[in-house]
Amino acid sequence: MANFLISVDKTLRHEGGFVHVKATGEVAKFGITVWFLREIGELPPAPRTDPARPTEISFVRRLTRDQAVEIYRRHFWERYRIGEIRDQDLADKVFDLVVNTGPGGWASIKGRRVFKRGALVLLQEAVNELRGKPLLDCDGILGPISLARVNSTEAGALLDVLRAKAADRYRSIAAANPPLAPNLHGWLERLAA
């Protein structure tokens, strides 16, 4: 079992303090956004298109590191079963990618079902690639079958393939969304860390 405190410490080195980008409406601290806090019930629900309210901005500004760690534990580490990955380095990277890209799988966006290639989908794809056949459904769910395959695959090789797949994903995001292209260098540096 991987150690959550090691993983979250590494991720928090990349996630900065309080951020309020007025042009986009993004408000976050320790990488935790107003929109995510709404989704998990820490703030009243509102459409994602609604800008952050002054009370929400104050709430995020007051968020402590300990509170952020607990949110990451419950809503990322435990929810997606990352702690059941045996190799610490692999668990660290999977956790950081889930925080940065989401888990992946089917999502509802503006009333449409959309498949997203997030961290857990990329991990499942990496296992299949290394095994040379589609052993896993790439659905973004880290269930018992996926965990068994992840834990029985050589961790160093799996980490290398996962990083390559994530780098390709970041490049495709930047190419499809020119306003995000300036973030590509930072995403790739974080991925290599």
Give the role of each language-model region:
Residues 1-193:
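Cell-wall polysaccharide-cleaving catalytic domain and substrate-binding groove, primarily
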